From Swiss-Prot:
F-type ATPases have 2 components, CF(1) - the catalytic core - and CF(0) - the membrane proton channel. CF(1) has five subunits: alpha(3), beta(3), gamma(1), delta(1), epsilon(1). CF(0) has four main subunits: a, b, b' and c. The chain crosses the membrane at residues 38-58, 95-115, 134-154, 199-219, 220-240. The gene is atpI. This is ATP synthase subunit a, chloroplastic. Keywords: ATP synthesis, CF(0), Chloroplast, Hydrogen ion transport, Ion transport, Membrane, Plastid, Thylakoid, Transmembrane, Transmembrane helix, Transport. SUPFAM superfamilies: F1F0 ATP synthase subunit A (SSF81336).
Length: 247
């Protein structure tokens, strides 16, 4: 009995260490609506960082670029290249949208690892990266869906919907289903990767608090940047596809 109770106590201890709570939220009531307060707080912080960086970038441009100006110009050229590669020659109007998506997701992902959110105590739940919440990733994916529908309809008019019966009307249900799976795949891919990364770091810090979590945190920073690039690239690809035709 002593051996059995000892084993049970060990299992309970391991359960307590790895029992990371997911899904608790701090709610705000705005009118008749209930919103996730912690997501709004962290999103506002990310937006403030982006607006502050943009203000610094354009406040005093130099003929001979400074190191900071070179950095922001490099970021802009990178976003332009991604947009042009995926959308084609008509990429220009979509650079702000793709750039906003990429930078918001990139800074949001990195904020989860670099900003000490846990210093701010909430009545329920805790602060984390905005992209750690499924509501944020679904909202970004739905914005992408609206964007590629708008791109297709603005270029082709109602003829855009003809793609659903190409190459044969038999594929109509599959083609319609495809447009529903695009935002789902975008949102769940981003949410799953960011949540899993933060949970792995939290569990490792609980088990081995000093050295072991550091390489995982650096790997998380790398994968966070890759996830932002994947989301922006796929968003641009969907927009380009809606403008060119069904593939």
């Amino acid at each position: 009995m002593n051996v059995l109770s000892c084993s049970i106590n060990k299992l309970n201890g391991l359960y307590d260490i790895s029992g990371v709570e997911v899904g608790q939220h701090f709610y705000w009531k705005i009118g008749g609506f209930q919103v996730h307060g912690q997501v709004l707080i962290t999103s506002w912080v990310v937006i403030a960082i982006l607006l502050g960086s943009a203000t610094l970038a354009v406040r005093n441009p130099q003929t001979i670029p400074t190191s900071g100006q070179n950095f922001f110009e490099y970021v802009l050229e990178f976003i332009r290249d991604v947009s042009k590669t995926q959308i084609g020659e008509e990429y220009g109007p979509w650079v702000p949208f793709i750039g906003t998506m990429f930078l918001f997701i990139f800074v949001s992902n990195w904020s989860g690892a670099l900003l000490p959110w846990k210093i701010i105590q909430l009545p329920h739940g805790e602060l984390a990266a905005p992209t750690n919440d499924i509501n944020t990733t679904v909202a970004l994916a739905l914005l992408t869906s609206v964007a590629y529908f708008y791109a297709g309809i603005s270029k082709k008019g109602l003829g855009y919907f003809g793609k659903y019966i190409q190459p044969t009307p038999i594929l109509l249900p599959i083609n319609i289903l495809e447009d529903f799976t695009k935002p789902l795949s975008l949102s769940f891919r981003l949410f799953g990767n960011i949540l899993a990364d933060e949970l792995v770091v939290v569990v490792l810090v609980s088990l081995v608090p000093l050295v072991v979590p550091i390489p995982v945190m650096f790997l998380g920073l790398f994968t966070s940047g890759i996830q932002a690039l994947i989301f922006a690239t796929l968003a641009a690809a969907y927009i380009g596809e809606s403008m060119e035709g069904h593939h």
